[in-house]
Amino acid sequence: MKLRDSLAENKSIRLQAEAETWQDAVKIGVDLLVAADVVEPRYYQAILDAVEQHGPYFVLAPGLAMPHGRPEEGVKKTGFALVTLKKPLEFNHEDNDPVDILITMAAVDANTHQEVGIMQIVNLFEDEENFDRLRACRTEQEVLDLIDRTNAAA
């Protein structure tokens, strides 16, 4: 499942969301995936438990988090949700706080997680200007167009 197709089909984009804590921000993304029948509600708690155990493992770059759990923690099918925050939040990451872009990922297996999920997100942000372009998006279509332009350039 491609990032763009998942976001469009699942209507799992939320822009300029308001959240008080990093946990609230993660829940917004997971709730979009629950609504799209991509994950079970327990996926949220699995992510929180993993952070408690391993720290903020999914904060990948300055301003960017990719919350995800394991396939057996409630994933029904592979999918993505994209959330931008109105106000950046601290995730307690030493180098990459604060975060205002979250791409929540659910993968049916570890191979999909590595090869499909992470690679598509790396591709999107290979051009660092895409961070600011994404922050400037105000509609779902603007996000999809940005991904299309990035894919066309790749």
Curated annotation (Swiss-Prot):
Domain PTS EIIA type-2: 6-150
Catalytic residues in the record: H68 (tele-phosphohistidine intermediate)
Keywords: Cytoplasm, Kinase, Phosphoprotein, Phosphotransferase system, Transferase, Transport
Cellular component GO terms held in the UniProt record: cytoplasm
List of residues that carry Phosphohistidine: H68
PROSITE patterns named among the record's database cross-references: PTS_EIIA_TYPE_2, PTS_EIIA_TYPE_2_HIS
Pfam family, one: PTS_EIIA_2
Molecular functions per Gene Ontology: kinase activity
Subcellular location: Cytoplasm
Keyword Cytoplasm: yes
GO BP terms in the entry: phosphoenolpyruvate-dependent sugar phosphotransferase system
Induction (UniProt): Induced by L-ascorbate. Repressed by UlaR.
Membrane spanning stretches: none
Function: The phosphoenolpyruvate-dependent sugar phosphotransferase system (sugar PTS), a major carbohydrate active transport system, catalyzes the phosphorylation of incoming sugar substrates concomitantly with their translocation across the cell membrane. The enzyme II UlaABC PTS system is involved in ascorbate transport.
Classification via PANTHER family: ASCORBATE-SPECIFIC PTS SYSTEM EIIA COMPONENT
Domains: entry comment: The PTS EIIA type-2 domain is phosphorylated by phospho-HPr on a histidyl residue. Then, it transfers the phosphoryl group to the PTS EIIB type-2 domain.
Protein name: Ascorbate-specific PTS system EIIA component
Organism encoding this protein: Shigella sonnei (strain Ss046)
Lineage, uppermost ranks: Bacteria, Pseudomonadati, Pseudomonadota, Gammaproteobacteria, Enterobacterales
Gene: ulaC
